[in-house]
Amino acid sequence: MNHLKSPARSLAGLAATALIACALPGGALAQAEGGLYIAENRFSFERAAKQGLARNPPGQRFFVLALPPNTAALTQAASTSAATVRNQVVAAGGVLFVCQRDIDNGSIDPAQLVPGVVAVRGFPPRGSDAIPRGERYFPDENTANLPRKNRTLKRLRSACS
């Protein structure tokens, strides 16, 4: 019995293997999730947002959290340059966050936030059952807006605690 394959059959097998190999990375990229970039006292919103844009390919979800005084970039009163960068983040697949605690303490007026900005809660107090045991999210949170990676979600909640 001849175990040698015909050139056409070998070529077809090679093409199928190449097609699968090319398809897998694209599918893996669609599942990939970028990091969290925090605009805080020493790191402006524009700098954090540009870092997120530079480190994540278009379409890969990443996250930008703005803490006071950098939250102005997420409002209707944002400067032209801040609004431009903010819009670039959203167009590239970025998610914009503010902390719910900053809304609760009056540092941010939620009526001034542009559509699409998500208010995220920090960790509940120790001993609280606000997040059910074994879960990562509050029961009423829209998990589609939040990071899937545990490390990123923990950083986000820590920054807002």
Question: What are these regions, as identified by a protein language model?
Answer:
Residues L29-T80, R86-Q88, G93:
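N-terminal secretory signal peptides
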